């Protein structure tokens, strides 16, 4: 059975794992208040979605 000849270093291990990561969510600016919000979702700050008040604050 094959075994590693040398121990894999931390640097080599981390370089191999550079592509294993989470994607950053798409953030957009709210046209009403200017706060950043997730796309296609209600703004947490002002409660508007697509120009209509969905959540009253």
Swiss-Prot record:
GO terms for biological process: translation. Transmembrane segments: none annotated. Coiled coil: none annotated. It comes from the Bacteria. One of its GO terms (molecular function) is structural constituent of ribosome. One of its GO terms (cellular component) is large ribosomal subunit. InterPro entries: Ribosomal_bL32 (IPR002677), Ribosomal_bL32_bact (IPR044957), Ribosomal_zn-bd (IPR011332). The keyword Ribosomal protein applies. The keyword Ribosomal protein applies. Keywords: Ribonucleoprotein, Ribosomal protein. Belongs to the bacterial ribosomal protein bL32 family. This is Large ribosomal subunit protein bL32. The gene is rpmF.
